Amino acid sequence: MAAKDVKFGDSARKKMLVGVNVLADAVKATLGPKGRNVVLAKSFGAPTITKDGVSVAKEIELKDAFENMGAQLVKEVASKANDAAGDGTTTATVLAQAIVNEGLKAVAAGMNPMDLKRGIDKATAAVVAELKNLSKPCADSKAIAQVGTISANSDNSIGEIIAEAMEKVGKEGVITVEEGSGLENELSVVEGMQFDRGYLSPYFVNKPDTMVAELEGPLLLLVDKKISNIRELLPVLEAVAKAGRPLLIVAEDVEGEALATLVVNNMRGIVKVAAVKAPGFGDRRKAMLQDIAVLTGGQVISEEIGLSLETATLEHLGNAKRVILSKENTTIIDGAGADTEIEARVKQIRAQIEETSSDYDREKLQERLAKLAGGVAVIKVGAGTEVEMKEKKARVEDALHATRAAVEEGVVPGGGVALVRALAAIIDLKGDNEDQNVGIALLRRAVESPLRQITANAGDEPSVVADKVKQGSGNFGYNAATGEYGDMIEMGILDPAKVTRSALQAAASIGGLMITTEAMVADLPEDKPAAGMPDMGGMGGMGGMM
């Protein structure tokens, strides 16, 4: 095991503070409407220019192991805020820096670190409760656009396109962000339920100009096994042919003579049919088949529930207004499922989202929820260069997270004003002893730091602005973009309550841990021996040169 270097007390905390300040100073330059850019060098290709706090934080590694620990802990603050609300990383970093700097001064002055932390935690809980009281629901499209605009560093076009996407697919709908091919941002919306499986044979295509198979008013046969024997399918095919309706078969697979017979029947016009593989794998496939069954008012033909293909009747089949199959995707439009059953299924998926601890599972469940509840919108980001594209895409993703958070927990006045107004909750708050009171006072000063930093980045005097904002009340604040004071909500400067809350909680959590640090352990740097002179072989016979 490699030898370790151990630092204690003040010398450990001083080193850690250097790392905290290096990372926070780089990140906080990006805060607010007049935040500056940070250029990140890449080992290959052009450097990246960004105003996204978490992107800057991720790039920073320091040479000194103890300083690096401080930097990595602040990076953890940014990623914690990002995980909780998808935004607010820069605000969280600024708050953490203020808490750690003030806290370590108090520790150096002889305060008890544990009591300081208790005071900070008590004050944080009170501020979080006050933020909840300050928040207003974010229901209309205008408010959603304003939140998106602020989060995308005051880019109106991004806020508007996100609001439009949410309007079209609903609050539960999936909105994905992709790189576009033009200069402008574009929005495309897929109505109905779409899954990434296409037709099993090109012979099902009935629109050769677009290479799609379109079925009007089809019946849907949902089967959770492979179909290779046509005899199993005959009873259903005959019943469908009598009904004179098209048929879509969604099964684990359709192969061999079963697929060949379906193709022949389709080409001869005996029965209009198309087949597609069921989406997903394993248990997820079963769940998605059940989703399609609920959406279309059908039943999955499964031996697990005692149903077989031979005994299937028209009552077991789902109904839809239209189905479109391309080579890669299948879209079911206007399924005939009962609203009450769809709502019950949505509720069940929501409960699973709450319970799961896996990010991957959560993402897949969100997709299933969207397919049942709303639809899918794709925002294609347009930009002039590759560098701009990456930067813009990161901002669109941030704005999207922020608007979702706003819909979830409401909005508060932006520009750091909400935290200043939430100070009211801790003006008279008292701890159990004097050291806890110092912790509460410390947080009282720290919550002003985002407002001060936004002002400093705009080139104004932070103390003057902070005092004027504190003298005001309600939504009164400072618009750093225009240099004016006024009602922040009327000026369209809104922050999601969830983002502000998550930023403060992440900063207080890690800030409190850093204040209570007493020892730090790191690997000793290895002393590499100086490289020797290379062998001068082949240089013999030079004796006569003297």
Curated annotation (Swiss-Prot):
The EC number(s) this enzyme carries: 5.6.1.7
Alphabetized Pfam families for the sequence: Cpn60_TCP1
Keyword annotations: ATP-binding, Chaperone, Cytoplasm, Isomerase, Nucleotide-binding
Residues reported in the UniProt entry to bind ATP: 30-33, 51, 87-91, 415, 479-481, 495
Subcellular location: Cytoplasm
Gene3D superfamilies in UniProt: GroEL, GroEL-like equatorial domain, TCP-1-like chaperonin intermediate domain
Family matches, as InterPro entries: Chaperonin_Cpn60_CS, Cpn60/GroEL, Cpn60/GroEL/TCP-1, GroEL-like_apical_dom_sf, GROEL-like_equatorial_sf, TCP-1-like_intermed_sf
Catalytic activity, as annotated: ATP + H2O + a folded polypeptide = ADP + phosphate + an unfolded polypeptide
NCBIfam families registered for this protein in UniProt: GroEL, PRK00013.1, PRK12849.1, PRK12850.1, PRK12851.1
Similarity annotation: Belongs to the chaperonin (HSP60) family.
Name listed for the protein in its UniProt record: Chaperonin GroEL
